[in-house]
């Protein structure tokens, strides 16, 4: 006979952070939003000249564009996977919201200045879609078909092992 460790109930802040009341269909938004970040992160390493350090060197005034591009790619891969599986989803959205705002500032706002507002609106459609998807996930959580939901149903928060 093996003894099982009792489970501790998740604290109120853990439930707010990892809990979700969103419908199961939220998985569709997670797959699209997380999948795009995963794909874009991988492509920064597969095509470094066009999408990674080379692109960052051309489009951003940041020092050491290679380090920024690589960090961005790593964050997109890690957060993309977390969003897809629904683990720490709300936390994973935060750096990606910053990422999308950075994309707006460094790549799209200059377009509005030089080519006009309509060119900006046209070219920034993907960033706006990603940004609104991320804000949605930040507000409602991962949904019923997620690791966040599974862990909070069991009374544990992610990262909390048996006691």
Where would I find each of the regions flagged by the language model?
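Extended, low-polarity transmembrane helix blocks
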Residues: 1-47, 66-74, 78, 85-163
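Membrane-interface interhelical connector segments
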Residues: 45-67
């Amino acid at each position: 006979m093996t003894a099982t460790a009792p489970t501790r109930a998740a604290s109120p802040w853990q439930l707010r952070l990892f809990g979700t009341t969103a419908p199961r269909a939220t998985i569709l938004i997670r797959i699209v939003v997380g999948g795009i970040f995963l794909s874009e992160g991988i492509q920064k390493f597969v095509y470094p000249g066009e999408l990674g350090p080379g692109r960052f060197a051309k489009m951003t005034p940041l020092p050491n564009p290679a380090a920024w591009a690589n960090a961005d790619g790593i964050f997109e891969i890690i957060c993309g996977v977390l969003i897809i599986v629904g683990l720490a989803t709300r936390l994973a959205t935060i750096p990606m919201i910053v990422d999308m705002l950075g994309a707006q500032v460094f790549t799209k706002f200059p377009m509005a200045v030089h080519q006009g507002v309509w060119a900006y609106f046209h070219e920034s459609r993907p960033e706006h879609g990603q940004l609104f998807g991320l804000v949605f996930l930040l507000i409602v959580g991962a949904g019923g078909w997620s690791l966040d939901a599974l862990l909070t149903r069991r009374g544990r928060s992610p990262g909390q092992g048996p006691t």
